[in-house]
Swiss-Prot record:
Disulfide bonds join C89-C119. It comes from Spinacia oleracea. Binds 1 [4Fe-4S] cluster. This is Ferredoxin-thioredoxin reductase catalytic chain, chloroplastic. It is found in: Plastid, Chloroplast.
């Protein structure tokens, strides 16, 4: 007689003197990503934070406000989804772990230590792409990022 191979495995565990049958199926792990707009509150929080940090650090927003808008919106998305303003301009194998660690949370360690912002959100005055502004309006962010 031939043995049949099951596609589903079963494990038995003993719980308080009774046997429990637990069914385990082997499914590939996958991640489903969905595009969720950040809340207006988070965008406003990140906008105000960015303005305040630019003033405090003596840095300026990019001459192309589209760059500034996209980065602020990305920070707001991460604030909503991860609970922290993780740098939106980097690739992460595990965003949640990176957000917990804090190294790449805005302002990131390279920005705090050396005034090096990979996102071009905070630029030193001598940077060729630095504008003259340390402010940006919420309406400007909405307008630039409306179709993204």
């Amino acid at each position: 007689m031939k043995a049949l191979q099951a596609s589903t495995s079963y494990s038995f565990f003993s719980k308080s003197s009774s046997a429990t049958l637990q069914r385990r199926t082997h499914r590939p792990q996958c991640v489903i990503l969905s595009k969720v707009e950040p809340s207006d509150k988070s965008v406003e929080i990140m906008r105000k934070f960015s303005e305040q940090y630019a003033r405090k650090s003596g840095t300026y927003f990019c001459v192309d406000k589209g760059v500034t808008s996209v980065v602020i919106k990305g920070l707001a998305e991460h604030k909503d989804s991860l609970g922290a303003p993780l740098c939106p301009c980097r690739y992460y194998d595990d965003k949640a772990a990176e957000a917990t660690q804090g190294f790449w949370n805005c302002p990131c360690v390279p920005m705090r230590e050396r005034k090096e912002c990979h996102c071009m959100l905070f630029l030193t005055p001598e940077n060729d792409f630095a504008g003259k502004d340390q402010t940006i309006g919420l309406d400007e962010i909405r307008e630039v990022t409306a179709n993204m």
